[in-house]
């Protein structure tokens, strides 16, 4: 009887699509949305300072992927929000601030600032480009992956208790960074090991690329 019930249970769980209230995307995912909406125009897709508005206004490029690494979250909040920005002097003012940098204190909440900084950290630390749309990736993750990998990607989904599997912790950047985008796409499409299913024929190539992009953000 167990041999019959378990496959039915697995298929049923994979078919469940959690509602929006169950979603709990991590900070970098939320920060990316803010960055795309408010920052990318000047700072560019990858944070290199080469956005179209910056070029049109002839603003000197600021490469965020290098400048954020040595700065604290508190410092970056001051730069972005404008609160206490006047106390920034010397090299930091020359390298990070310009008269064209808006003050976002009336736009971003504290939690939004935290999320935005998390995404800036991702841009500064990642070795891999986002190859698809993470928003699509989130939906596919909730639909197909969350049941094993867990709500936040920590490998603690309900299936781990039911059949004793131990999925990869997708929030571990050391683990995910060693895998290229090509590696992750292959693992998802073709499966890996005893318990990682092959999703070829179920997920499209674009779905998988979006999923990989969301996975990249889970670890930041």
What is the role of each PLM region?
Residues 1-5:
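Positively charged n-region of N-terminal signal peptides that target proteins for export
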Residues 6-15:
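Bacterial N-terminal signal peptides
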Residues 16-34, 118-140:
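Electrostatic cytochrome c docking/interface patches
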Residues 24, 48-49, 86-90, 121-133, ...:
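Inter-heme linker and motif-flanking segments adjacent to c-type heme-binding CXXCH motifs
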Residues 32, 48-77, 104, 154-181:
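Gly/Gly-Pro-rich "capping" loops immediately C-terminal to redox-active cysteine motifs
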């Amino acid at each position: 009887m167990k041999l019959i019930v378990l496959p039915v249970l697995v298929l049923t769980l994979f078919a469940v699509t959690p509602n929006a209230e169950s979603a709990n995307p991590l900070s970098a995912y939320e920060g990316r949305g803010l960055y795309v909406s408010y920052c990318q125009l000047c700072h560019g897709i990858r944070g290199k300072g080469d956005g179209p508005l910056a070029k049109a206004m002839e603003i000197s490029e600021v490469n965020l992927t290098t400048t954020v690494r040595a700065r604290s979250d508190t410092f970056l909040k001051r730069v972005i929000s404008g609160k206490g920005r006047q106390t920034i002097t010397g090299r930091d003012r020359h390298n990070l601030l310009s008269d064209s940098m808006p003050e976002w204190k009336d736009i971003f909440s504290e939690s939004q600032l935290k999320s935005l900084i998390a995404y800036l950290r991702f841009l500064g630390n990642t070795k891999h480009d986002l190859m698809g749309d993470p928003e699509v990736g989130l939906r596919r993750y909730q639909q197909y992956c969350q049941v094993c990998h867990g709500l936040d990607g920590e490998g603690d989904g309900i299936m781990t208790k039911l059949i004793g599997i131990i999925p990869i912790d997708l929030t571990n950047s050391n683990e995910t960074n060693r895998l290229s985008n090509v590696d992750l796409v292959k693992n998802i499409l073709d499966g890996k090991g005893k318990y990682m299913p092959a999703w070829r024929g179920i997920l499209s190539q674009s779905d998988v690329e979006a999923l990989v992009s969301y996975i990249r953000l889970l670890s930041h």
